[in-house]
Every structure is written in structure tokens, then in C-alpha cells.
Amino acid sequence: MKVHTEYLTFNTEEQYEMVHITPQVEAIVRRSGIDDGLCFVSPMHITAAIYVNDNEDGLIEDIGTWLEKLAPRWPGYKHHQTGEDNADAHLKALLLHHETTLPVTHGRLDLGTWQRVFYAEFDGCRSKRVIVKVMGVVKN
């Protein structure tokens, strides 16, 4: 079994931002040389998430609206008593997956027709990192 690890780094420009990262993750899978296995993708931040869904603008906006209804920006969170102001970002990250594991088949991500990988940022405007770990077998 082989394990290959790389990190994605980028800057988010908005407090709340969905970043389509499928092409970058696919490139890491190709560079790994792994033919069959799994690709683990996880943000290295507690106010962010990784999820798989359709890359359609209306749906992305709907996800944001849904998350804001479930975890609105609100000054009354107990977390804010510590001097922080991002409790809603922590809660939104909990509602989406903190990480995802994707199948790798024949050296490529094995995604459905409309499946795409996203980094979801809820406390942005700074440099961010995502770990991508590909594990599996290399066929000769």
C-alpha cells in the first residue's frame, strides 16, 4: 500500500465562501500514482468543511441560505462570551462534513456525473489549508 499526502493552500476573500476544489484534488490523485484506493480530504480549520455536491450556482446559494437559517450570525452565542465572534461558523461547519473520503479507481477520482468537491469557509478572509491524503495500491 502507498500513501501520498499534499496540501492545498489558498486565500478566501469572503467571510462565507464555497470554493470548488475538484480539479486540484484530481491533480493530486494523478500525481500520487495510486491506481485503486481512497482519497481523504479535510480542512485544517475548525470553521470550515469539505462536502460533495453539484456545482450549480443556485444550489450553492441555497446551501448558504439553509445554513444561515440553521446557524445565523447572532451575538447571543455562549462562545462569544470568550471574546470570539464566530460561533455561527463553528455550527455551520458541523452541519456539513468536516472531511470526505472519495474512491479512487484506475488512478482517478471515481465521482458521479454531477458530484464535485467543495471547501466551505465560514470564517474567512485569510490563508487556508486543506490536507489531501491518497491511500491505495499501485498496479505495475
Where are these regions (language model features)?
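Active-site histidine-anchored catalytic micro-motif
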Residues: M1-N140
